Amino acid sequence: MFTEITPEQAGISSRSVAKFIQKMEQRGLYNHSVLLARGDRIFCEGYWAPYNADSLNRLYSQTKSFEGIAICLLADEGKLSLDDRIVDHFPEKIHREIPAHLSRQTIRHMLNMQTCLTDPAWFADKSAVDRTEYYLNRIPPFRTPGLVWQYDSAGSQVLTSLVEKLSGMRLLDYLKEKLFNAMGTFSTARILKTRNGDSWGDSALLCTLRDVASFGWLLMNGGKYGDTQLIPEALVQEAIAKQVDCDETGFGEAFHADGYGYQIWHFLDGFAFVGMGGQLTVAFPQRDLLFSITGDNQGYPGAYSLILACLQDFILDELQDSPLPENPEAFAELQSLLSSLQLKHIPGPTESAYQNTLNGVRYICEENRMDISEFSFRFDSEDTGVFCYRNAQGYKELPFGLGKNVFGKFPQWGYSDEYGGLSGGDDFFYDCAASAAWREEQKLVLKVQIIDKYLGNFFAIFSFRDGGACVHISKTAEDFLHEYYGWINARAE
């Protein structure tokens, strides 16, 4: 559905777009893909290899915006009212006397995230098989709904269950029938499942970059595709408008500064879908500008603000209402930059005189929470190595690059696959990228990026002196990599 134009045709210089990409790189952001469009005309599209145009990106909480529109479509069909009490739609799942606050909670409250509940850590409670049942029975309500905004991801999952109950279809199948089949998008997309088989609608849509951008464009275009009004325009305007204030800090942080609609963030003069780790789709209807980006910046303080600051400085401030004269040389330079993008590796020196001393030495670990009992390093060449270690699962090897990523399978098994919160088995492993740098002569820092249906990362800092080693591993990942977080003291054998 998209066409491609030069930045100059879009009203911005190719050099400004190149500076935008370069500044994000300089800021150390771990991005996977980026797209900029004026309406349905793309003027910048890039992928950090191994990601490409066909890659399915985990959107995390951007998924909520899809579920929110699905709820609105069901309301338009007359299958629900936004002012319905949520408890009236799930009598079969309620096994307690309904608390007063919960009895007053409506679908609209949930769309706006003004619920009566706190967001539960359902991952940790293995008995939380049916998240809707868990939400309605196990979480104590503590405030009147409709008064205070607080992020409630679990409530979004309940709304997903409602979509599937009332439509009789999977969330994505329903949206395909209503929207995406007509647009020719989301043909390869899918949604992971919760433990009981419901679509994981608050977190787990996987789709291409153009897919998610097309959804942003549809809402920016008032729900109209070609001559067909796929979503009533009034409904779109209601969904993307500021329904409630959501500034919890008083500092006006990027997405808490302006407001919240129906599972859609409102800020500046536009709206956004926002997902963990740097998944963003931002639309500015007044300027006909669309921006989508994916990545894994979990654990990077201020990543969203950095991305938006770069967008403001190099795109929004430079964008003109009329086309600019073509600049073939600058455009060629931009295309060269975009085609050369590689998944970021950890920066730092790739050589140390200590490397030969460390090579092959076995370290015996003191008792630690990660159950790593021993480790060693093997350096196969000047720019590659292997982290060898033994933990509760047995002996493992993790190849890594120096000054580059090495791609492979992360050796820990038992993490979730199609069903969130359930093990994928002992023969299922996530794709990963690993790199290392010598930050000091006797300090090696290893970074591992999980680049699969689930995104996560960890840093491991290995400091050596006088036959001893101190190791600090710090992970950022939702419900996995728990075995890679803590401290180790070790001695050379």
Predicted regions and their residues:
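Alpha-helical scaffold elements that line and support the substrate/ligand-binding pocket
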Residues: 13, 40, 60-79, 85, ...
